[in-house]
Amino acid sequence: HPIVNKQTISFYPNDYNSIFQYVDVVKEEDTIRVFNVHLQSLRFSKENLKYIEKPTVEDENKALKESKNIIAKFKKGFLKRQVQADRIRAEIEKSPYPVIVTGDFNDVPNSYAYHTIGNNMNNAFVEKGSGLGRTFSGISPVLRIDNIFVDTKMDVLQFNLVKKKLSDHFPIMADVAMPKK
């Protein structure tokens, strides 16, 4: 299907994973705007992850310092994702076409980013997925931080989570259809 328009937006200069883009795709007489997003990660270091997985209190000062470092990264991530979610939502609202939003939200389903971006849209996992839907292979066995949201005018036909470790995220796919005219 031909792409008739494209746009890439970076939120923060020199920030490798803080970006989104969209393309307008023509299918027969319909045009769909597809967003691909990668919201701010927590940017945990190996030391952070090691401490999260197995907190130690042998040295109280070191433990306190590591805990404060982790909390600061959570705060920074939440605040940046709030700004990003608001910007993406504004672009969704401006779209003259039905929208699909897919990507790495780096946030869970009860988060501000999830609800802001997914407002008045259907989540493909919720519609057709099953189980916990874990998409992140690290830290926790239950983190679903990757999403596919579709316009309510579209039907989600199926959702698939691929349990292959190709990166630190498991791939997700959905088949969607425009309603018959």
Regions found by a protein language model. Give the residues of each.
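Surface-exposed cleft-lining segments at the edges of enzyme active sites
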Residues: 8, 70-78
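Short charge-dense sequence patches
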Residues: 35-39, 61-67, 98-101, 125
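A solvent-exposed, charged loop/short amphipathic helix patch at secondary-structure junctions
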Residues: 49-73
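Soluble or luminal CAZymes and related metallo-dependent hydrolases
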Residues: 15-17, 76-87
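Phosphate-binding glycine-rich loops and adjacent basic patches that engage nucleotide phosphates
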Residues: 44-55, 75-79, 108-113
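Metal-dependent phosphoester-hydrolase catalytic domains
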Residues: 82-100, 105-181
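Structured beta-strand-rich core segments of catalytic domains in phosphoester-bond hydrolases
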Residues: 1-49, 148, 160-163
